């Protein structure tokens, strides 16, 4: 018996093929669904924070990452004029100054 003859005997029924086609969109939807965050990492970005030593005039931009499944606390990341990114400590006066400036503008 040839290999082709064996495979001819294993053809699925039309009902089975139709069932497979019906489940295909569900399988694709489940496998393409990712975590909420686009970076794919479900952990806090700010492992270490800075509480002092940075003046507001050295900050060029801010990024706020709200609390969620990835991290229990909101994170505030400041980009400095030299390109360095730092995480600000939520309990520090600097954090409160930055938030106040954001709310005033």
UniProtKB/Swiss-Prot annotation:
Pfam families named in the record: IL8
PROSITE patterns attached to this UniProt entry: SMALL_CYTOKINES_CXC (PS00471)
GO CC annotations on file: collagen-containing extracellular matrix; extracellular space; platelet alpha granule; protein-containing complex
Domain of life the protein comes from: Eukaryota
Predominant location: secreted
Signal sequence residues: 1-29
GO MF assignments: chemokine activity; CXCR3 chemokine receptor binding; heparin binding
InterPro entries tied to this protein: Chemokine_b/g/d, Chemokine_CXC, Chemokine_CXC_CS, Chemokine_IL8-like_dom, CXC_Chemokine_domain, Interleukin_8-like_sf
Disulfide partners: 44-71, 46-87
SMART domains: SCY
List of glycosylated residues: 31
Keyword list, A-Z: Chemotaxis, Cytokine, Disulfide bond, Glycoprotein, Heparin-binding, Phosphoprotein, Secreted, Signal
GO BP annotation list: adenylate cyclase-activating G protein-coupled receptor signaling pathway; antimicrobial humoral immune response mediated by antimicrobial peptide; cytokine-mediated signaling pathway; defense response to protozoan; leukocyte chemotaxis; negative regulation of angiogenesis; negative regulation of inflammatory response; negative regulation of megakaryocyte differentiation
Compartments in which it is found: Secreted
Annotated positions binding heparin: 96-102
Residues bearing PTM Phosphoserine: 61
Subunit organization: Homotetramer. Interacts with TNFAIP6 (via Link domain). Interacts with CCR1. Interacts with CXCR3. Interacts with THBD; this interaction enhances generation of activated protein C.
Stated role: Chemokine released during platelet aggregation that plays a role in different biological processes including hematopoiesis, cell proliferation, differentiation, and activation. Acts via different functional receptors including CCR1, CXCR3A or CXCR3B. Upon interaction with CXCR3A receptor, induces activated T-lymphocytes migration mediated via downstream Ras/extracellular signal-regulated kinase (ERK) signaling. Neutralizes the anticoagulant effect of heparin by binding more strongly to heparin than to the chondroitin-4-sulfate chains of the carrier molecule.
Protein family according to the UniProt entry: Belongs to the intercrine alpha (chemokine CxC) family.
Protein name in the entry: Platelet factor 4
Species of provenance: Mus musculus
Source lineage: Eukaryota, Metazoa, Chordata, Craniata, Vertebrata
């Amino acid at each position: 018996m040839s290999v082709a003859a064996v495979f001819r005997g294993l053809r699925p029924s039309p009902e089975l093929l139709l069932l497979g086609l019906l489940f295909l969109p569900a399988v694709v939807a489940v496998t393409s669904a990712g975590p909420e965050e686009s970076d794919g990492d479900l952990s806090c970005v700010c492992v270490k924070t800075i509480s002092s030593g940075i003046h507001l005039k050295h900050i060029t931009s801010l990024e706020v990452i709200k609390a969620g499944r990835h991290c229990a606390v909101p994170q505030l990341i400041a980009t400095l004029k030299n390109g360095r990114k730092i995480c600000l400590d939520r309990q520090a006066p600097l954090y409160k100054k930055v938030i106040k400036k954001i709310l005033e503008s």
